[in-house]
Amino acid sequence: MHPHLDVNNQKQCADLIRALEECHKSFGKFFGECNTIKYELKACLTKDRNDKARLNRENARMRKKVIEENRKKEEIEERILTDRILQQERKKSHANEGAGDNNN
């Protein structure tokens, strides 16, 4: 069984699709004359599907890697920002402590 055959969607297999369609117009389809073309088409469609799946997996891995890198960058930026805020608060508290000592 194969998916709906569309020359536009399965461009790599277009010649085989056309050949099978032509073969099916004759009575040879009832006597197995189209079987060879059908098997070649099935192999072509399988290869096409596997190639697309491989590309999709590679793209997903790349997207996942980019997302992970962005997440790590955001974590680093957040740590830096948190450290700066803490340093500023420490400076303020030290300045307030120093100002309090001068008043006594």
From Swiss-Prot:
**Can you tell which superkingdom this protein's organism belongs to?**
Eukaryota
Question: Pfam families, per this entry?
Answer: Cmc1
Q: Which GO terms describe its cellular component?
A: extrinsic component of mitochondrial inner membrane; mitochondrial intermembrane space; mitochondrion
GO function term, MF aspect, one = copper ion binding
User: How does this protein sit in the membrane?
Assistant: Peripheral membrane protein
Which InterPro entries does the entry link to? Cyt_c_biogenesis_Cmc1-like
The record's keywords, sorted A to Z, are: Chaperone, Disulfide bond, Membrane, Mitochondrion, Mitochondrion inner membrane, Repeat
What's one GO BP annotation on this UniProt entry?
Answer: mitochondrial cytochrome c oxidase assembly
Q: Where in the cell is it found?
A: Mitochondrion inner membrane
Could you tell me which residue ranges the CHCH domain spans? 10-52
UniProt short sequence motif Cx9C motif 2, positions renumbered to this chain: 34-44
Q: What is its main location?
A: mitochondrion
Q: Give the residue interval(s) assigned to the motif Cx9C motif 1.
A: 13-23
Report disulfide bridges, numbered on this chain: 13-44, 23-34
Q: Would you identify the family this protein belongs to, as annotated?
A: Belongs to the CMC family.
Domain-level remarks: The twin Cx9C motifs are involved in the recognition by the mitochondrial mia40-erv1 disulfide relay system and the subsequent transfer of disulfide bonds by dithiol/disulfide exchange reactions to the newly imported protein.
Role of this protein: Required for mitochondrial cytochrome c oxidase (COX) assembly and respiration.
Name used for this protein in its record:
COX assembly mitochondrial protein 1
Name the gene for this chain: cmc1
